[in-house]
């Protein structure tokens, strides 16, 4: 089976700074991959290259068998910031891309109804974003991304600004949507528990310059539940990922984290 996303010797330089050094990674169709690593290791840079928002200095990235040369409708992007249009209602935000594409009002309504229901926002369809909590705004952003029917979702720390309980709820909402439609997901996070809970595989990136350090499989069944979070199997994988990330930290960061 051909990978859905392929990073082939991807290099990214900013002036004299090497942000990514020969990144090689394949992500399968329908796979949910999380990417972790120390700050500055190039996680977001890799995602922005996959989104077509940045052009690599070397190498290439393929979606299917086509090189990525810019943004495309087969890739939906969700950032930490909610990026909703404040003057549009929740439904209008979800339907925005469909409207731009010239889809009929009836078809747009059918699609927005489906995805608003999927993320639990049916009762807020006519509300403006200012009336929503942070978690609800991000659910709206997820519904909008899904409504555009991308084959791939690229998510850059989408839950980082949420409180702990809302974050857990959003993880479950996202997994529920993913389990129904099996889009390919590349999810950037600094949260090791989140990385393990969501993923089929956890990609650990090495520090400065960014490159692939190791891939850790998450052999836990779906649907993921609170019981899985509390299981010894989860703890074992979490500890493996945590140690992999911790040992990528620069020595000065490790010392400061111990109060030295």
Curated annotation (Swiss-Prot):
PROSITE patterns reported in the protein's UniProt record: ABC_TRANSPORTER_2 (PS50893)
Predominant localisation class: membrane
Keywords noted in UniProt: ATP-binding, Cell inner membrane, Cell membrane, Membrane, Nucleotide-binding, Translocase, Transport
EC number(s) given by UniProt: 7.-.-.-
UniProt key word Lipoprotein: no
Gene Ontology CC terms, in alphabetical order: plasma membrane
Location of the protein in the cell: Cell inner membrane
SMART domains found in the cross-reference section: AAA (SM00382)
Residues the entry annotates as binding ATP: 37-44
Annotated ranges, domain ABC transporter: 5-228
PANTHER family named in the record: ALIPHATIC SULFONATES IMPORT ATP-BINDING PROTEIN SSUB, TAURINE IMPORT ATP-BINDING PROTEIN-RELATED
The protein's role, per its UniProt record: Probably part of an ABC transporter complex. Probably Responsible for energy coupling to the transport system.
Protein name as catalogued: Putative ATP-binding protein BruAb2_1123
Organism encoding this protein: Brucella abortus biovar 1 (strain 9-941)
């Amino acid at each position: 089976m051909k990978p859905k996303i392929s990073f082939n010797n991807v290099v990214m330089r900013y002036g004299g700074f090497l942000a990514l050094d020969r990144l090689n990674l394949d992500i399968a169709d329908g796979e949910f991959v999380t990417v972790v690593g120390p700050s500055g290791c190039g996680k977001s840079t890799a995602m922005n290259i996959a989104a077509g928002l940045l052009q690599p200095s070397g190498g290439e990235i393929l979606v299917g068998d086509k090189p990525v040369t810019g943004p495309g409708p087969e890739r939906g992007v969700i950032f930490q910031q909610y990026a909703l249009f404040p003057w549009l209602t929740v439904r209008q935000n979800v339907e925005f891309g469909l409207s731009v594409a010239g889809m009929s009002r009836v078809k747009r309504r059918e699609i927005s109804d489906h995805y608003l229901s999927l993320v639990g926002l049916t009762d807020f369809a006519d509300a403006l974003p200012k009336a929503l909590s942070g978690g609800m705004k991000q659910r709206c952003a997820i519904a909008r991304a899904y409504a555009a029917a991308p084959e791939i979702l690229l998510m850059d720390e989408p839950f980082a600004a949420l409180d702990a309980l809302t974050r857990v709820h959003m993880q479950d909402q996202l997994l529920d949507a993913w389990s129904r439609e099996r889009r390919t997901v590349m999810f950037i996070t600094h949260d090791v528990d989140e990385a393990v809970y969501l993923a089929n595989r956890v990609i650990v990136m090495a520090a400065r310059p960014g490159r692939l350090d190791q891939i850790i499989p998450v052999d836990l069944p779906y649907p993921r539940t609170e019981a899985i979070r509390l299981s010894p199997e989860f703890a074992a994988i979490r500890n493996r990922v945590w140690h992999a990330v911790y040992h990528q930290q620069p020595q000065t960061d490790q010392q400061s984290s111990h109060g030295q």
